[in-house]
Amino acid sequence: MSDEQGWYLMQQYQEQVEELYGQAELIERLVNEYHRTVETVQELSDIPSQDTLIPIGGSTFVYGTLKDTGKVLVNAGRGILVEKPVNAAIDTLNKKIEELKKSQESILKTAEEIKGKMDELAQKMSEKDVQIPQKED
């Protein structure tokens, strides 16, 4: 492998690692959102009926009334909503959280494997006394 090829491969590895970390961060945000949703569903299930504000987007709200807090609609995929009792909905949300965490672990493992390849390549290049240019921000 030429010096230029080694440097190019190192750059590709770095970009892959950054992309994977970005995906892991997005998953972390989704996990946090699901945790907040579980908390909200639990809190609302204790309230029999209540007037509330409903967000409709763009920091705009409408008045509404929570009528039946014992059931919630959960996205089953492909835009299909399924009505579930609170406990079943919470179980579904917790399963989604676990799936997301497994995906995140897999992504982070892949990133670490690529970083290992980067370390090996850097070692080989340093043995050849190749100077790796620093990435400019």
What are these regions (language model features)?
Residues 1-76, 80-137:
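Intrinsically disordered, low-complexity regulatory regions in eukaryotic proteins
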